[in-house]
Design a protein with these regions (language model features):
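Bacterial N-terminal signal peptides that target proteins for export
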Residues: 1-9
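Bacterial Sec-dependent N-terminal signal peptides
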Residues: 2-3, 18-34
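Contiguous, well-folded functional domains in the mature portion of proteins
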Residues: 29-417
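Bacterial N-terminal signal peptides
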Residues: 9-18
Length: 417
């Protein structure tokens, strides 16, 4: 706790005096830093080019948002200090100052901003990285910093799974906020939650909390459903002409399905859709269709933001822009389900932002028959995405209007084309 109070005090003094808290010579990694930051310091000292890119990203972020109330990490040393602070906080406590807007003051808004600020720092587009094949020309995709982001995400996730991350007052905060749905009678008894991640991956009280619709495809999770994307005969996503994505790996369905799968080419000419889970959603995922489980895999990827983060000075909020394609590089899982009438369906939970944990239930086994709506796994803290892919010859008609769906509600009708 001493480091936390020191961080608050230091930032407060800087704000009062209107000066930078930066230091020209950050200390050697010792006990004053967390293990994650010690690792980062060593990586930066061993890789001066990447260190320079990170420093430029931090500086560029400070030029975009110089307001220290909302952007306290404006030097490399301050970035180290911020990460030390960040990975020992609940998501809604990460940002000391909240936006004055109604959204920014809400628990959901503070959580959203607590997740997004880190990515704003490392999401800055850098000229040196343009046209070099990165998803975005940002330092978050440059090694070894890119790999360290997994350390950062894992370190925060580990703390969020400790008893220190949960108590009765934290429960009261979320229980009193309707955005989290705890007053609806949907979930298991709160006495089962002994950490923030226990709460975040909470179970339903009974199957009746999420009735399963009589539709070909149901929502695999509480989520915001998106549109359909066509897959070409070359197994590449077909992008609208106004969507500029230049690297082939961001459209390759085989790459999305992952190395080592027997089904990398099975969806050429088919259709893809995806649905986004927000941070306050129920974060367990269920089978969208009935059928036989033919493959069950985990696919390692990067711990990236799932898009890029920008700053709106008027509202004092960070906001996100994500194009289809980020799923190709994120940590994800893949289940191949063979249906009786409509061939193979791929269901792919995708970790986003500080989420790098997609977890299948241990009871799932290849060759099992699974019923539509059966629980299959869960995410730990953050926002996330679920991709569903259908084969050539299957006509997919969406049954939603883009509004939020609960798991089990009608998502799509399937037919033969």
């Amino acid at each position: 706790m001493e480091r936390i109070y020191s961080y608050i005090a230091a930032i407060t003094v800087c704000l009062l005096l209107g000066v930078s808290c930066g230091k020209d010579n950050p200390p050697e990694p010792q006990q004053q830093h967390t293990a994650a930051v010690e690792e980062l310091i060593l990586l930066m000292e061993a890789n001066p080019t990447v260190k320079s890119l990170l420093e430029k990203s931090i500086s560029q972020a400070a030029a975009v948002n110089p307001d220290r109330r909302y952007n306290p990490a404006q030097s490399l040393y301050e970035f180290y200090e911020f990460v030390d602070w960040n990975i020992r906080q609940l998501p809604w406590e990460v940002m000391i100052t909240a936006s004055p807007t109604q959204y920014g003051q809400s628990l959901y808004g503070r959580t959203d901003q607590g997740v997004g600020y880190f990515w704003f720092i490392v999401d800055q587009p850098l000229d040196e990285l343009r046209d070099r094949g990165y998803y975005y020309p940002t330092v978050e995709f440059v090694e070894p910093f890119s790999s360290w982001l997994t350390t950062y995400a894992s370190s925060w996730g580990e703390w969020l799974s400790t008893a220190e991350s949960w108590n009765s007052s934290y429960y009261s905060i979320v229980a009193s906020d309707p955005d989290w749905g705890l007053s609806n009678g949907w979930y298991e008894d709160a006495s089962n939650w002994h950490s923030f991640n226990d709460f975040f991956s909470r179970k339903l009280s009974s199957p009746s909390a999420r009735p399963i619709a009589d539709a070909s495809v149901v929502a695999p999770a509480d989520s915001w459903p998106k549109e359909l994307w066509r897959i070409g005969e070359d197994n590449q996503l077909v992008f609208p002409s106004d969507l500029q994505i230049k690297t082939a790996k961001l459209s390759d369905i085989g790459a999305l399905i992952g190395e080592g799968s027997a089904y990398r080419e099975a969806f050429a000419g088919g259709t893809l859709t995806h649905t986004f889970l927000d941070v306050n959603d129920y974060h367990r995922y269920h089978a969208p269709v009935s059928g036989t489980l033919r493959e069950l895999r985990n696919i390692p990827g990067v711990a990236a933001g799932g898009g890029y983060t920008m700053w709106d000075d008027e509202s004092k909020l960070y906001y996100y822009s994500n194009d289809m394609g980020f799923q190709m590089i994120e940590t994800r899982s893949c289940a191949i389900i063979e249906t009786e009438e409509f061939g193979l369906v791929a269901m792919m939970p995708v970790g986003m932002s500080q989420i790098c944990s997609c977890n299948w239930l241990p009871s799932l086994k290849v060759a099992d028959h699974i019923e539509k709506g059966k629980e299959m796994g869960y995410f730990l803290f953050g926002g996330s995405d679920i991709v569903m892919i259908f084969q050539k010859g299957v006509e997919v008609t969406l049954l939603h209007d883009g509004d939020h769906l609960l798991m089990g509600q009608a998502y799509a009708k399937l037919g033969k084309s």
